[in-house]
UniProtKB/Swiss-Prot annotation:
Residues 92-152 are annotated as: Important for chloroplast destabilization and the formation of CV-containing vesicles. It is a single-pass membrane protein. It comes from Arabidopsis thaliana (Mouse-ear cress). This is Protein CHLOROPLAST VESICULATION. The chain crosses the membrane at residues 48-65. The gene is CV. One of its GO terms (cellular component) is intracellular vesicle.
Amino acid sequence: MAGRISCCLNLPPLDSNSAQSLASLLKTTSKISCRRTENETEPRKNKCSFVLGVAATVVIGGIQINDVASVEAAVVKSPVEEMAAGVVPPRRWSDKRTCPPWLENSLETIVPENLPRPSAHRRLELAGLAKGDAPPVGVVMTRVNRGGCFSV
């Protein structure tokens, strides 16, 4: 939907030869123009339609705000109501702890809740330094290893 609002003020013309003082300009009040346009098929563009547009916007905005508040009240329940209704929250991995609780000044790494931890079966001894030197830059060297390993 496209719309256009135009407003004209009936201000007195100002020219450099005018002898009107600033006080006389301040005493005159400007009025909003209510003239119709040349094309009578266009909707009325005057202060009445502007006021109606503003009033409609306020009413629709009030309805929307009321609607959002009522939907929020109906959908969002407090945790106390959920506990009273018998809804059990899902179990967290920290509730299934196998080690003793964290002690102050221990060097345990604190991982945020519900983030995956590295596997406990991983062994760092399997990774080691290569026995040979690195190949020089620009040379690609591949070896065939028949021991069930692969090369990258």
